[in-house]
């Protein structure tokens, strides 16, 4: 959705597009490099990564650990808790460069559109908010066809799903999620099962913060969380489905994989 937005605004509308990725811990250095390369291929004038991982941890994530927070006793609020911090980072950058508008790829299906729109309206009230996918009611296939027809080649095999990756888990939307009774196939998950059997996991907390994993001490709690995620994801731990009420008044169904949250909260 965002890729389509960048290309369409640059090629069809003549916008000078500044592409920004607000990273809350979900991207590796390699993935961020790919984001940058793709942004320029799509027609962006400039690309930046805005790292807000530690801000997110200090102002939100650690309190969810303190409170063992699970929405409806199922969902660790994986990506939804990050959206405000991503939105604020984008808004600050938009003001820094003197942007006339802010565009995002929300589809209109759930809560993210509200989180982003409200953040931008509060922090950048004079800027136009552009949401092509939502306002034009575009299907994912229409966007893929447009990108292909304009020479942008990529692996679109998983584009039946929409992934939002963060340090506190990955949400998966689309495909079987749109049916009330189907589960996700193994191939839908970004992190594949590579281990079977059992393994001992020892977590050490100091004043509610994760400080050590299997005796290995971490000065940075974020690094400790990533270590737990690496261990648990290999076994497919933390995969589930959540159904809840959205801000816009409809039921929302989302799949997720969140090994670290489920292990840490369980501990």
Predicted ranges, named:
Residues 1-267:
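Nucleotide-activated chemistry modules centered on ATP-dependent adenylation/adenylyltransferase
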């Amino acid at each position: 959705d965002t890729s389509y937005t960048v290309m369409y605004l640059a090629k069809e509308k003549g916008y000078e597009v500044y592409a920004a990725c607000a990273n809350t811990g979900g991207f590796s250095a390699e993935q961020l490099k790919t984001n940058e390369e793709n942004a320029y291929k799509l027609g962006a004038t400039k690309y930046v990564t805005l790292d807000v991982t530690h801000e997110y941890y200090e102002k939100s994530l650690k309190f969810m650990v303190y409170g063992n927070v699970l929405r409806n006793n199922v969902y660790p609020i994986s990506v939804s808790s990050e959206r405000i911090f991503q939105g604020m980072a984008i808004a600050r950058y938009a003001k820094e460069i003197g942007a006339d508008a802010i565009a995002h790829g929300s589809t209109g299906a759930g809560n993210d559109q509200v989180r982003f729109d409200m953040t931008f309206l509060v922090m950048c009230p004079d800027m136009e908010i552009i949401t092509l996918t939502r306002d034009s009611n575009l299907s994912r296939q229409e966007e893929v066809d447009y990108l292909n027809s304009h020479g942008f080649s990529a692996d679109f095999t998983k584009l039946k799903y929409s992934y939002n990756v963060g340090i506190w888990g990955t949400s998966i939307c689309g495909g079987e999620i749109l049916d009330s009774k189907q589960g996700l196939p193994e191939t839908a998950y970004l992190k594949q099962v590579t281990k079977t059997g059992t393994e001992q996991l020892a977590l050490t907390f100091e004043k509610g913060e994760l400080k050590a994993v299997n005796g290995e001490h971490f000065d940075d709690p974020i690094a400790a969380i990533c270590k737990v995620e690496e261990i648990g994801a290999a076994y497919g731990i933390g995969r589930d489905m959540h159904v809840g009420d959205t801000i816009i008044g409809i039921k929302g169904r989302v799949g997720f994989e969140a090994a670290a949250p489920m292990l840490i909260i369980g501990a």
